[in-house]
Amino acid sequence: MITGKLITVEGPDGAGKTTVLEQLIPLLKQKVAQEILTTREPGGVAISEYIRELILDINHTAMDPKTELLLYIAARRQHLVEKVLPALEAGQLVFIDRFIDSSVAYQGAGRGLIKADIQWLNEFATDGLEPDLTLYFDVPSEIGLARINANQQREVNRLDLETIEIHQRVRKGYLALAKEHPKRIVTIDATKPLKEVVSVALEHVLALLLA
């Protein structure tokens, strides 16, 4: 039985969501006694991390969009049963850096795959599990890509080679999802100063936990 809460973190490339999450968790630990787990997709467990390497390998430019989607779905399933569900059943507060919405935004809006097919695969992989809250960090594609290019410490992966048009379609896909699920997805302006973005995210998380 699930007694914990699931919060997912989403955003286009360069939105800074991972950095926000790194700063958010220590602040949250000062305010709640609940045990907190942070993890990521694709990855989080050994099998899923191996799949992550396949997906992001810069040499795999011939990867078909459906192959890419199915790899993400496989990684999602293994991660869920091995790590996420046990934590939720133990009453933990679980944060996942990317989840079901990423597939709809990237492989759906970005790659042009059929949304209904992606939603079916998501439901198949998760047994219908949905986040209690999704923090969507929004940033224009031009700003996001500029941030990525400015980060010299970040290793370039296959997805960094995509055109700005694909990144723009991904963002539009996310914005459409936010309109479709207004009770679950909160949109946060990620162009604001980092401290302000973290503060807004913290407010939304605490509102969920104290509801």
From Swiss-Prot:
Residues that hold ATP according to the record: 11-18
Disulphide connectivity of cysteines: none
Keywords of the record: ATP-binding, Kinase, Nucleotide biosynthesis, Nucleotide-binding, Transferase
EC nos: 2.7.4.9
InterPro entries: P-loop_NTPase, Thymidylate_kin-like_dom, Thymidylate_kinase
EC category name: transferase
Superkingdom to which the source organism belongs: Bacteria
GO biological processes: dTDP biosynthetic process; dTTP biosynthetic process; dUDP biosynthetic process
GO cellular component terms, semicolon-separated: cytosol
Catalytic activity: dTMP + ATP = dTDP + ADP
Gene3D superfamilies in the cross-refs: P-loop containing nucleotide triphosphate hydrolases
A Pfam family matched in the record: Thymidylate_kin
Protein family according to the UniProt entry: Belongs to the thymidylate kinase family.
Function per UniProt: Phosphorylation of dTMP to form dTDP in both de novo and salvage pathways of dTTP synthesis.
Record's protein name: Thymidylate kinase
UniProt gene name: tmk
